[in-house]
């Protein structure tokens, strides 16, 4: 076989491989259908709350910024929630490699890229010990959907769409912006700011999968 035919065959193989990689990447980043919410759209507050409360399973992907004790860090994240089970993967410029926090109502574990795994009764204790900061996972499964934890005292403000713009609950002050309609039913935020004491979390949600 001539060199020209070999080169042509190699190029064809590389082209097929490239197409497969692009296809797989597209599948990996596919998100649930989203549409913009106009300023004229006004949601029924009670209906919206109950729809979001019933939403028990999702995946959110994006970037989180952490400010604590005059330090600042950031990371990419993938957050999965399925009922009471959750998984938060953090990776990127954290300075500690990638980590995954998994848990349910009974226990929480933290695994790092070195293969080390630690367990505790709650995520706050584990994250403070290992990272120096924490994500309030018990409340986050509600707050990331822009709803309050049921049956716990809270104060809130609504925007012109009748969606949460501010929420204070469990000692946290939370603000929301840039909502989008996911799956033609769920108005979900793309930017969240959470503050308590000397800790501030800035969460950008780039995609929702439900």
From Swiss-Prot:
Superkingdom as given in the UniProt entry: Bacteria
PROSITE patterns in the record: PROKAR_LIPOPROTEIN
Lipidated positions per record (S-diacylglycerol cysteine): 27
SUPFAM superfamilies, alphabetized: Prokaryotic lipoproteins and lipoprotein localization factors
Lipid-modified residues, N-palmitoyl cysteine kind: 27
Span of the signal peptide: 1-26
Keyword field: Cell outer membrane, Chaperone, Lipoprotein, Membrane, Palmitate, Protein transport, Signal, Transport
Gene3D superfamilies per the UniProt record, alphabetical: Lipoprotein localisation LolA/LolB/LppX (2.50.20.10)
Annotated function: Plays a critical role in the incorporation of lipoproteins in the outer membrane after they are released by the LolA protein.
Family (UniProt): Belongs to the LolB family.
Subunit structure: Monomer.
Listed name of the protein: Outer-membrane lipoprotein LolB
Source species of the chain: Francisella tularensis subsp. novicida (strain U112)
């Amino acid at each position: 076989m001539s060199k020209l035919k070999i080169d042509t065959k190699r190029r064809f193989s590389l082209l097929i491989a490239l197409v497969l990689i692009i296809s797989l990447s597209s599948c990996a980043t596919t998100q649930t259908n989203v549409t913009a919410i106009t300023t004229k759209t006004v949601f029924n507050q009670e209906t919206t709350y109950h729809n979001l409360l019933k939403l028990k399973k999702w995946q959110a992907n994006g970037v989180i910024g952490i400010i604590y004790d005059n330090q600042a860090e950031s990371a990419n994240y993938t957050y999965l929630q399925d009922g009471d089970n959750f998984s938060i993967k953090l990776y990127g410029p954290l300075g500690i490699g990638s980590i995954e926090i998994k848990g349910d109502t009974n226990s929480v574990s933290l695994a790092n890229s070195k293969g080390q795994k630690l367990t505790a009764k709650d995520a706050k204790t584990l994250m403070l010990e290992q990272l120096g900061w924490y994500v309030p996972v018990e409340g986050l499964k509600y707050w990331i959907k822009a709803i309050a934890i049921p049956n716990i005292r809270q104060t809130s403000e609504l925007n012109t769409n009748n969606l949460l713009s501010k929420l204070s609950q469990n000692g946290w002050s939370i603000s929301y912006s840039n909502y989008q309609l996911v799956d033609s039913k769920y108005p979900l935020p793309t930017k969240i700011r959470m503050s308590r004491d000397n800790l501030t979390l800035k969460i950008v949600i780039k995609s929702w999968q439900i």
